[in-house]
């Protein structure tokens, strides 16, 4: 008399046969311990990780960030109050060459009082230019004030030290009475004015357009020197419309519609998979090589770097300027944009042909022009500026947060 065996019973018998020393059990335990215990414990405070516990930490971290920004704003204010004035005739660093190689144009409006965003930005640029020394003698700081009100205290203070272009100085502008001109279009027009002023005033080789809440990273000048003098001599980079120096960290994950990210992600698996397989085989005393084990570790490493956060692994590239990557740009955002002079002139023409509105800001306008005009643009990774402005100049935000 034969008896039938249920699938559940067969599965149970197979599981019983598995010993703690079997490869399948060991890899299963590794997966559970890594993704269920170790990674969540290690990464629950990492802002750009999938393991980040938003409800536990976001409010506190946002408040701490704002308090720190206030302190740094006060420090930047004292920094300039203690510097000798240059009466606005030359930059406080030194007199740049008659035709600068790079003009650093900081676009500023009057923002939330107390944070002194633009002072933080300019003071950091000043420190870095001093550290850079003779290598940066062809760099020129330039402030572009697009605030309609005359009460922009920080811009007035900086005019003692840095050359300033004031868009609305001595003009009767009826922008506020024109219902067809919205804040997004005005921001684009301000951008065009500042870019054009930079070209007309200095006729440089490059213009770096920096918004007044984008603080430069320590490595910005060595990296730009390497990129512009070495990497951008390559044919596919030479005629780029612009190079972005910032992309939001929250948008830097691998799971993204950009093909280059997917290729990079697969590359991570192809690199770490064999390495982790070799380590496992060595310490587990397994003979030979196993393709299934390598496939497991490839997927394991790909999942780990994505869930922990690609942003944090990109930071390893800061070890050397040559490790920074240049990849095709996406549409968001414009805190820091580098334009070669010929491309800057093309950009002025392009932007004069588009009208910005809510949902179609200047960043989207610039990105849309790439396909329409057959242009190319790139972004450098990791970021070369830090975005510190939680208070937008376009949108009212009474409860700012880091996400």
From Swiss-Prot:
Disulfide bonds join 132-136, 144-194, 332-333. Golgi-resident glycosylphosphatidylinositol (GPI)-N-acetylgalactosamine transferase that catalyzes the N-acetyl-beta-D-galactosamine transfer from an UDP-N-acetyl-alpha-D-galactosamine to the 4-OH-position of the first mannose of the glycosylphosphatidylinositol (GPI) of a GPI-anchored protein (GPI-AP). This modification occurs after the fatty acid remodeling step of the GPI-anchor maturation. Changing residue 311 to A: No effect on GPI-GalNAc transferase activity. No effect on Golgi apparatus membrane location. Keywords: Disulfide bond, Glycoprotein, Golgi apparatus, Membrane, Transferase, Transmembrane, Transmembrane helix. The keyword Translocase does not apply. A motif (DXD motif) lies at residues 211-213. The gene is PGAP4. UDP-N-acetyl-alpha-D-galactosamine binds at residues 109, 334-335, 362. The chain crosses the membrane at residues 23-43, 260-280, 288-308. Glycosylated. Contains three transmembrane domains, including a tandem transmembrane domain insertion into its glycosyltransferase-A fold. Transmembrane domain 1 functions as a signal for Golgi targeting. The conserved DXD motif is involved in enzyme activity. Glycans are attached at residue 87. The keyword Disulfide bond applies. Belongs to the PGAP4 family. Its EC number is 2.4.1.-. Its main location: Golgi. Changing residue 87 to A: Loss of glycosylation. Not glycosylated. Glycosylated. Residues 44-259, 309-403 are lumenal. The lineage of its organism: Eukaryota, Metazoa, Chordata, Craniata, Vertebrata. GO terms for cellular component: Golgi membrane. This is GPI-N-acetylgalactosamine transferase PGAP4. It is found in: Golgi apparatus membrane. One of its GO terms (biological process) is GPI anchor biosynthetic process. Residues 1-22, 281-287 are cytoplasmic. Changing residue 334 to A: Almost abolishes GPI-GalNAc transferase activity. No effect on Golgi apparatus membrane location. GO terms for molecular function: glycosyltransferase activity. It is a multi-pass membrane protein.
